[in-house]
């Protein structure tokens, strides 16, 4: 099938100004916004995700925000399914979808497709792997992965718990390494779309300033109180995907400690800042490798980006 349906992908590292640009474009009335963010999907996780306020979402509605609780799991495959359905619905209205966010795995899965024959998640197998980790430690689980799938073992770290679980899960269900299956299996790519990729890549020094400002605001408006409320409401633990989100992981570790001294709090804030910078670095690297992409230095040429997108799709 020929590519006929335009889709705008508005990408960028955390704190790069993606949402502001997307909202400015939305005001023209010919677009709908689809969030591409693995943290914004969670209800009640607002401050640490820099989620648009209820008032902002009323003015600039986003699909795929607040769709599950922090106890639930949401995969890249589910994102592709949900996003493609929304893209088709938006086109049926005569509008153009703008996918805006910084979760590069979601963008990669949409652009390149997913392996179609990998087994679905199995709750019993996953529970058995997590029980093994609880009893023997994650190093033991990682060592098992390295034995059955050396390629995955070389790629993953012991801290990559969800990726380790998925790789071992696939092996136990199929008897084959996940890396072998991924290399052999056909991809399901939505060829009916024409993707127009735009990446906001600000100067790194300026981006680091924006990240520091965002985190300072996060702490000052009650982020720790938010995480405390989440713990009480949902009985959260650090094995949940929601609690591996940058900021939440560090805050959860701090709040579960017996010693919440000033020094430990400062250490927690430093760890969150470092993790956020590392996330931005990974996002930056992936975006630079993406072909057929228009790049903008956010703080110097955002008007150029707005004008270019308006002229093309407004």
Swiss-Prot record:
Binding site for substrate: 14-19
Transmembrane regions: none
Cofactor needs: Mg(2+)
Enzyme Commission number(s) from the entry: 2.5.1.75
Positions contributing to ATP binding: 12-19
Catalysed reaction equations from the record: adenosine(37) in tRNA + dimethylallyl diphosphate = N(6)-dimethylallyladenosine(37) in tRNA + diphosphate
Keyword field: ATP-binding, Magnesium, Nucleotide-binding, Transferase, tRNA processing
Site (Interaction with substrate tRNA): 103, 126
Gene3D superfamilies assigned: 1.10.20.140, P-loop containing nucleotide triphosphate hydrolases (3.40.50.300)
Region spans: Interaction with substrate tRNA: 37-40, 162-166
Job of this protein: Catalyzes the transfer of a dimethylallyl group onto the adenine at position 37 in tRNAs that read codons beginning with uridine, leading to the formation of N6-(dimethylallyl)adenosine (i(6)A).
Subunit structure: Monomer.
Name under which the protein is recorded: tRNA dimethylallyltransferase
Organism name: Acinetobacter baylyi (strain ATCC 33305 / BD413 / ADP1)
């Amino acid at each position: 099938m020929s590519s006929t349906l335009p889709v705008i992908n508005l990408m960028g590292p955390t704190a790069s100004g993606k949402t502001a640009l997307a909202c400015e474009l939305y005001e023209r009335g010919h677009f709908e916004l689809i969030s591409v963010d693995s943290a914004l999907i969670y209800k009640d996780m607002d401050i640490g995700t820099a989620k648009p306020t209820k008032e902002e979402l009323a003015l600039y509605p986003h699909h795929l925000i607040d769709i599950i609780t922090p106890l639930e799991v949401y995969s890249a495959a589910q994102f592709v399914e949900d996003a493609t359905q929304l893209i088709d619905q938006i086109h049926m209205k005569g509008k153009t979808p703008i996918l805006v966010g910084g979760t590069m795995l979601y963008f990669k899965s949409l652009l390149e497709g997913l392996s179609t024959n990998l087994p679905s998640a199995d709750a019993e197998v996953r529970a058995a792997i997590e029980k093994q980790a609880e009893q023997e430690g994650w190093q033991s689980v990682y060592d098992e992965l390295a034995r059955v799938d050396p390629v995955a073992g070389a790629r993953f770290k012991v801290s990559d718990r969800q990726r380790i679980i998925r790789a071992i899960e696939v092996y136990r269900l199929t008897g084959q390494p996940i890396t072998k299956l991924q290399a052999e299996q056909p991809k399901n790519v939505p060829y009916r779309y024409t993707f127009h990729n735009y990446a906001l890549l600000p100067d790194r020094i300026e981006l680091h300033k924006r990240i520091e400002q965002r985190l300072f605001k996060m702490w000052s408006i009650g982020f720790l109180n938010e995480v405390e409320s989440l713990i009480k409401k949902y009985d959260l633990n650090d094995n949940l995907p929601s609690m591996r989100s940058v900021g939440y992981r560090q805050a959860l570790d701090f709040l579960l400690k017996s010693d919440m001294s000033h020094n430990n709090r400062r250490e927690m804030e430093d760890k969150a800042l470092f993790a956020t910078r590392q996330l931005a670095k990974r996002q930056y690297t992936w975006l630079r490798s993406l072909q057929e992409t228009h790049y903008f230095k956010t703080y110097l040429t955002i008007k150029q980006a707005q004008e270019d997108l308006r002229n093309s799709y407004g």
